[in-house]
Design a protein with these regions (language model features):
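Aromatic-lined ligand-binding clefts that engage carbohydrates, nucleic acids, or primary amines
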Residues: 246, 352, 363-390, 397, ...
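Glycine/proline-rich low-complexity spacer/linker segments in large multi-domain proteins
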Residues: 296-317, 424-473
């Protein structure tokens, strides 16, 4: 019987989960993202030293476990706070350990790791303890030409008690060779070692430039291949992005991809101060992948840029609602003049239903113009939606924003729009626990809460389900640029 034998993993990706019918869309999104994010090499500026000896020497009496539920060992450390600050301020970095640092060299004006990944500088975040071999190698990198940044202080001690005096003496001898001026900078061979209290000042001295898009609240991952630079960009703000965005990389042309749909096209770009700017439209919840070509001009079709909306066509009227798939029983179909959560229907079967309902409405549209893109906006959807227009499948939406281009499917006059909405299985699980059904029966690895307490969904609130709207069709004029 449903839901079958379930392991206590956080997500049940199997055919008994109602949302499983639309999981392929999510899988395709992940595939497209990973295909890019696993290509090439990291393209970050800073190597951030992980001062593990500070953690071990000052860790307290309890075990320091690497667990997702207890991240304080890094979140509350100086290194963790520095990492968060760098992310929030648009500075790119990768962590590096002592062993990895020992395999790092300076070559062609850059720090180069064992994997031949290139960085501009090394940052040591307030480390008190350091292996003397590591310190000696850091000084050697500076002597070869590297710029090394120490936040707040140089290390003052070596970890552990084995040969303590010998190792401490070697550390002191290495540090005494450094002579710092009034700007807390020491020349070391061809390079520099700089001590500073503020990260902004340190990065300015090392000529490390932040990504300007962080000023707009955009998050990003940057990669580099032999031919181009990749940006994965996410808008996790509540604001629409509709403007020129500067990137901290040179470029002659750029291509954009929506990893949710796979659509690609040239993106409008221009060069400014030896860097590239792109015209980016990104709604809250959306992601894009940019491919920047530093020296190559790419030809092709441009990604459509939507102009200013002059009217919105609300889809008001009568919605025919039919429950088409799921359980434990299909609720009775109904007619809605106003969209609402299906748990508010008078049919009690809807309270425990997990599955899909089909919403259908007829709408008359005005004469279409060639320069207009028609966007169907579903408003609030709980939780995924399959869209069909005039009996033609358009696409599946599984995340915000629940909007889709229907320009190629609608026609002048009357159109039939169908939206199949699938909810989560939570309400059905809730009902099983209310009834006391013994569905948790996996031997020795049963369903538990996040903190490994007995799992009980009987006190859960009903989860909103269905198409909540408001639903509208929006005709957007296209914005044209001189390069197109």
């Amino acid at each position: 019987p449903w839901p079958g034998w379930l392991f206590y993993a956080s997500t049940q990706v199997n055919s008994r989960n109602s949302i499983f019918r639309d999981i392929p869309v999510l899988n395709n999104y992940i595939t497209r993202c990973q295909s890019i994010l696993q290509e090439g090499k990291p393209y970050n500026d800073v190597l951030l030293y992980w001062p593990v000896f500070d953690l071990w020497m000052e860790g307290g009496q309890e075990e320091l476990r690497f667990r997702v539920h207890h991240p304080d060992w890094i979140e509350k450390s100086t290194c963790g706070k520095v990492a968060h600050w760098m992310i929030d301020n648009g500075y790119t970095f990768d962590f590096i350990s002592d062993n990895q640092l020992m395999d790092t060299r300076f070559d062609h004006e850059s720090l180069v790791t064992e994997g031949n990944t290139v960085y501009q500088t090394l940052l040591i975040p307030s480390a008190k303890y350091m292996n003397h071999h590591t310190l000696q190698h850091i000084i050697h990198l500076a002597e070869q030409g590297a710029t090394v940044l120490f936040l707040d202080n140089l290390p003052v001690d070596v970890p552990g008690w084995h040969d303590f005096k010998l190792r401490k003496g070697k550390m002191v001898a290495s540090l005494e060779k450094l002579s710092f001026d009034e700007n807390h900078t020491a020349q070391a061979g061809k390079g520099r070692i700089i001590i500073g209290k503020g990260l902004n000042r340190l990065f300015d001295l090392a000529n490390i430039i932040q990504e300007p898009m962080l000023d707009e609240g955009l998050l990003f991952i940057r990669r580099k291949s032999q031919e181009c630079v990749y940006y994965f960009i996410a808008n996790q703000t509540s604001r629409n992005i509709d403007k020129w965005i500067a990137l901290n990389t040179p470029g002659r042309s750029a291509v954009v991809m929506d990893p949710m749909t796979g659509w690609t096209g040239l993106i409008n770009s221009r060069e400014k101060d030896e860097q590239i700017e792109v015209y980016l439209q990104l709604e809250p919840g959306e992601t894009r992948i940019l491919r920047i070509y530093p020296e190559k001009t790419i030809n092709g079709d441009y990604w459509p840029v939507l102009g200013t909306v002059s009217e919105v066509i609300p889809l008001t009227g009568t919605w025919q609602v039919d429950f088409v798939e799921g359980g434990p029983e299909l609720p009775q179909g109904t007619i809605m003049d106003m969209l609402k959560c299906w748990t508010r229907l008078s049919d009690e079967r809807a309270l425990r239903f997990a599955g899909a309902a089909r919403y259908t409405i007829d709408v008359d549209l005005p004469v279409m113009k060639q320069t207009v893109r028609w966007i169907l906006d579903l408003g609030d959807v709980r939780e995924s939606a399959r869209i069909t227009v005039n009996n033609q499948p358009v696409g599946v939406l599984v995340a915000h924003p629940f909007r889709i281009d229907v320009s190629d499917y609608i026609r002048n006059g009357e159109n039939e729009i169908t939206v199949e909405v699938t909810n989560l299985s939570a309400n059905r699980i809730r009902d099983l626990d209310i009834q006391g059904v013994g569905w948790k029966k996996f031997y020795d690895a049963n369903i538990v809460t996040q903190m490994y307490d007995p799992f009980d969904a009987s006190s859960w609130d009903l989860k909103p389900s269905g198409l909540l709207g408001p639903v509208a069709i929006i005709p957007y004029p296209l914005k044209h640029f001189g390069a197109q």
